[in-house]
Amino acid sequence: VNEFTEQSLKIMKESPINKKRNDAKKKSLSCILLRDAGNKYPDVKPINEMYSMKFSCIVDMPVELGISEVLEMKAFEAGGLTDYEEKARVAAKAMETQNAIYVHLKGPDEFGHDGDAIGKMKNIEEIDQRFFKTLLANIDSNKVAIVISADHSTPCINKGHSDDPVPILVSGNFIKNDGTTRMTEKQAKKGSIGLIQGADVVTTSLDLIKSQIQPNL
């Protein structure tokens, strides 16, 4: 890794692309960031075997693409990072043949790293209006549940990740209301799911859904 980093720094320093960027008064490309590298392939069962279900995904980022390959999840193409309506339509269509589909939306995290609280708020509102509104219009909420959460928190004040708990919402017409009215950290504390570990999110959500969905659906 160190040798790769040293060579990449030298190559980028002499790159004609950086010369053009410098001439245009733009910042140079100075480093290739390597993170979360491993030295062996994870020994994990395919997710369909773990849960006896058909899982699939819509993901854009390299880490999530890697996870989907390791877990042998079918990946659906659904436009670019901000093609929220397309992602919602593809997800809804996929539910005709799949039992569950994981959709990873990157947007709010970027605003957190930039320390842009207003931008983060507006992006979450945009996702709500464009992705979830489209998704709800294309699924039967009497038969399909939606689980919303985050893989980590990115407080704008930190401009980085933190270990603060993130809210989780399990919603569907057949899911009993536990008194919460909004998806916020404060409301999540009052919810019936309680505080759980990230590794338990899928199992906890599936158990809740299976316990409340009508047997004939």
Give the role of each language-model region:
Residues 1-217:
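Feature captures the catalytic ectodomains and active-site-proximal regions of enzymes
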